[in-house]
Structures are given as structure tokens and as C-alpha cells.
Amino acid sequence: MDAFFSTYVWPTAIMIGQSLLLLVALLLFIAYVLLADRKIWAAVQLRRGPNVVGPFGLFQSFADLLKFVFKEPVIPAGANKTIFLLAPLVSVTLALAAWAVIPLNANWVIANINVGILFVFAISSLEVYGIIMGGWASNSKYPFLGALRSAAQMVSYEVSIGFVIVTVLLCVGSLNLTDIVNAQNDGLGTMLGLPASFLDWHWLSLFPMFIIFFISALAETNRPPFDLPEAESELVAGFMVEYGSTPYMMFMLGEYAAICLMCALTTILFLGGWLPPVDIWLLNWVPGIIWFVLKASLVFFMFAMVKAFVPRYRYDQLMRLGWKVFLPLSLAMVVIVAFVLKLTGWA
């Protein structure tokens, strides 16, 4: 009996506890990411943004949560009720599930699997199903058009993201996310004998792929200027037209969880994860998770500034950028990186 508990029960209980702790921390982080998104947008437009609920509006997201929870959900008469309610649940569940393999620090990961990057890529590819289900089940033209746009957009830019990941894997030689971070301990800064660890990270050696990944992440998460699936001026609110109350909140939660996931993935692949930017004792003393959160927050700030400054693309421009620019460019970079690694013997 003791062997049974030590082999199955306690490890399962510990994993459940870790998952709940990560879930609570992630939901709190998403609440303040949403607030930061609104504050940054307001600052660019010379407005104050949310500033009533709590000091500096810090509790605005929790007030919105209460508002959504206590509103009555209205289901359209012609909608498929089961799929209509299941769609936001699928969206938010998949967006949160991918965080199981994200290492926030050395050994701070729920499931340190050897194919972690493949798991994240697969989960992010499945998120489009929640949007398609919601658009189809609404039995309305605007949601259906938004869902079709989303499916085409996500499929188009997943190809480029896949090639970017292949390029990083060629340099690292592992699918494990922890190994990808640890591989960024050695690079240009180390070769030059400088303590500038940020020169070792992949953002410098793979700069074109860093730009492609960042822009493709915007398209993958339906962020402006690629928010065609929910374009307010064209499709009212896209696939979320018929949603309100808690289902709408779950779609929003899934969207921002996916955005935070892409910020974390950018941090891991290109910005050194939890590694400090300069290798000195004072910065090495700072916990790695602090560096991880700061870097992910910086990436999200870039997401928010793009939303504030860049106008929305037309649909044909979006498709042209994905298939005629990013796809051949990322494919060429894969070939170039593989050739350089083979030529120099770094592989």
C-alpha cells in the first residue's frame, strides 16, 4: 500500500496542486495584462483609461469579472446550444493547457517533457477549433465569416511559426524548452569574453526569425493589426457577435491566455528565458522567474504598442504577407542556418 501511495497517489496530488497554483497565478497575471493593455492604449490616445475601481484602476478586471458572471447568458434562437456553449470552454481550456510545459525558471515546470515545444505548437494549432465551433453554432453570418477568417489566418501563419521553431531546434538540438533556454548561455557575448549575456540569446543570431515569429504571433492570436476575425468595423465583433456574459468572458480569457503563451514562448526561444541580461553577481542574485516575467511583460508591451500604432491590414494583404513573404523567407532561413551550422561544425 505504501508503494502504491508513493508511486501513484502522492505524485498525482503534487501535480494537481502545482497545476492549481499555476492556474491561479496565470489568471491573476492575465487580469493585469488585460488592464495593462487598456492602460497602454489609453496612454497612446492621451486618455487615462480605467481609473475608478481601486487605486489607479487596479481592480477593474475583477469588477469586469463580476459583471460578466452575474449577467444572464443569452443564446440565439437558431443556435446549436450545446456547441455554442462548448466553444468558449474549448478555447480557454486549450489556451491554459499549453502552460503545463512552460518552464518559468530552472526546474519550475509542471511537465518537463522532451517534446515540449511540439506540445505547445500542437495545442496552439487546436485553439482555432473553439473559434470555428462558436462561429458556426451562432447561426449568424458575421460570426461564421469571422470563424472562416480565423481558420484561414491561423493556418497561414502556423506554417511560418513552425519554420521559425525548426530554425531554433537546429541551433539547440533539442525539443525540450528547458534545454532551449540553457543553450542560450553560450553565444556571441561568451565568445567575446563579455558579461553581456543578452548577446548570447537567439534574438541576435536569429534576428530575422525573431521578427517573423513576433509578427506571426500577432496573427496567430488575432491581435491588431491582424484582428480580422473580430474586426469591429467590418464584422461588428466577428465570431463573438452573439456571445455575452460568462461565455464571452471565457473567449476573452482564452484569447489573452494565448497571447501570454506567445509572449512566454518568445521569451524562451529568443530572449533567454529566466537568464539575466548581464552576467554579474547582483543580477544573478535575482530569482529567474522575475527575469522571465519581466521579459514576457516587455514582449506584451510590444504587442500593445503595435495595437495602438499600426492600422488593420486588409484580408488580402494579410494572406499575401503570410504566404508570399514570411513562408519563403522562413524556409530560406532554415536552409541558411542549416548550411552555416554544417559548414562551421556547430551543429
Curated annotation (Swiss-Prot):
Its EC number is 7.1.1.-. GO terms for biological process: aerobic respiration. It comes from the Bacteria. It holds the Pfam family NADHdh. It is found in: Cell inner membrane. One of its GO terms (cellular component) is plasma membrane. GO terms for molecular function: NADH dehydrogenase activity; oxidoreductase activity, acting on NAD(P)H, quinone or similar compound as acceptor; quinone binding. InterPro entries: NADH_UbQ_OxRdtase_su1/FPO, NADH_UbQ_OxRdtase_su1_CS. PROSITE patterns: COMPLEX1_ND1_2. NDH-1 shuttles electrons from NADH, via FMN and iron-sulfur (Fe-S) centers, to quinones in the respiratory chain. The immediate electron acceptor for the enzyme in this species is believed to be ubiquinone. Couples the redox reaction to proton translocation (for every two electrons transferred, four hydrogen ions are translocated across the cytoplasmic membrane), and thus conserves the redox energy in a proton gradient. This subunit may bind ubiquinone. HAMAP family: NDH1_NuoH. NDH-1 is composed of 14 different subunits. Subunits NuoA, H, J, K, L, M, N constitute the membrane sector of the complex. This is NADH-quinone oxidoreductase subunit H 1. It comes from Rhizobium meliloti (strain 1021). The lineage of its organism: Bacteria, Pseudomonadati, Pseudomonadota, Alphaproteobacteria, Hyphomicrobiales.
